[in-house]
Amino acid sequence: RLGGLRPGQSLAVDPLTAATLFESQVASRLLDHTARWLRADGHGYYTIGSAGHESNAAVALALRPSDPALLHYRSGGFYVARASQVAGHDAVGDVLRGMLARTTDPISGGRHKVFGHRALNVIPQTSTIASHLPRAVGLAQWGARDAGRGDVVVCSFGDASLNHSTAQGALNWAQHTAHRGDPVPVLFVCEDNGLGISVPSPEGWVADRVGRMGMEVESVEGDDPAEVLAATSRLSGHVREQRRPALLHLCCVRYLGHAGSDAEAAYRTTSDVRADYERDPIVGAGRLLVDAGECAGTDLVEWYLSQRVEIRERALALLSEPEFESATQVMAPLAAPDEARVATHATAFHGSGRGGSLE
């Protein structure tokens, strides 16, 4: 579909932003395909991807790189786009190392493929459903004490997670805090692909539920990147200025099933799967570039294929980096803290005048 794009009338996004968005989305999609390619050859350990959710890259570009992010596990697009805002950061290398469980993985040391990096202000999450929402609310309250920073905490999650008691408790906490008049600058992003692994969300459920939450809410289609950028800008501006929570309902699709082992054909019809390909966020981003006269659809296809080769070559090169050799290495961070190490870290954090003693 990229190759068939022709110039249109949509010039709502400047060419540089459109190019960054497209590049971030493509990198994320190709990382997902690379994960399956590696697994088929006996390499790599993680195949849950972000394909179809890449519109979250537009959410990242509409925020500041200093805004703390606690992300859904399908947030590859966001992670790559956030890295594009920080000079010299290698998001593709980060994700590949996690995928391959290399000890050089910068966030988990090869223990789990998870989105996170201190330099990007992306806080890593566990795989426990909705467990990061309370953390996001708490972080927003804590950060709001420094009114001069004006940070917005962004927290993304899936439509099925919305039904989890942990999510409901966190959303209620945010609303309750705002109702008291206390600042809680958090932007929730519900990435709604209509499926909780193999269980479909009832049609209209998410829209109805978030519409009753008593906070500022906007709903956008993920294959309309100009509107995702605009809606995120509006909502983040509201949160930043009013110090109150808001929610972006991001309607998207899911490609490649839940994970590599998922037999999607067992619970979805062929026509449903095909219909999703009419809502591809990458085609939406590519349309922005073609409409701006920056390139033709065939140019985008050629570039996409060249990037596929490059990312696969990088993945193969990373196979030479070290893996864990023992369970002891894997569990090392769980070991009881050594008193001398604790004292050293405390001194380094607080300075020589504080925290240097455990007495």
Task: Locate predicted features.
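Conserved thiamine diphosphate
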Residues: A147-R149, P202-R234, E278-L305
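Glycine-rich, charged/polar anion/phosphate-binding loops
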Residues: A170-A174, A230-G237
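Cofactor-binding active-site loop characterized by glycine-rich and histidine/acidic residues
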Residues: L30-H33, A40-V184, I197-A207, G211-G214
